Amino acid sequence: MYYKGMKMSKILLVDDDIELTDLLAEVLRLTGFEVEVANNGQEALDKLNESHQLVLLDIMMPVLNGIETLKKIRQTSNVPVMMLTARGEEIDRVLGLELGADDYLPKPFNDRELVARIKAILRRATQQKKKIYKIQPHFHQKKIHWNFVA
């Protein structure tokens, strides 16, 4: 089930392993997420739009690898990205995070851990969107003073 107060979130799952994407998509759908699949980085960039709340991204893929895909996503979007990859060495994890990934989960992984991490990322992203700054003008002798209130 998706967590209370959260509408069904749309996830873009990007991996060239068809069997894995089929399995993961089914697990995520049963958990309450809407899932769209792309099998390489270029396909992901073509499909990515504002309706996606999260991208799950492999690194080792044909056409456009996950690192290059992440760089291109970060040029135009702040959508949360979680790397899901067999490249689990410390240098790979650090590089992914430094390039803008929000989380990094090496394969193989536990389905429950994946879903828990997804929910945590979406919860943080939702909380950030709710922080709306109110601008309150105050007039004082023909000058306007602005107070920004969080």
Positions of predicted regions on the chain:
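Short, Lys/Arg-enriched segments at the junction into DNA-binding effector domains
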Residues: 10, 120-150
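Acidic, metal-coordinating helix/loop segments flanking the phosphotransfer/catalytic sites
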Residues: 37-54
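Active-site residues of response regulator receiver
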Residues: 58, 85
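Charged docking surfaces used in two-component/phosphorelay signaling
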Residues: 22-30
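Short amphipathic alpha-helix used as the core "switch/output" element in two-component signaling
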Residues: 46, 67-78
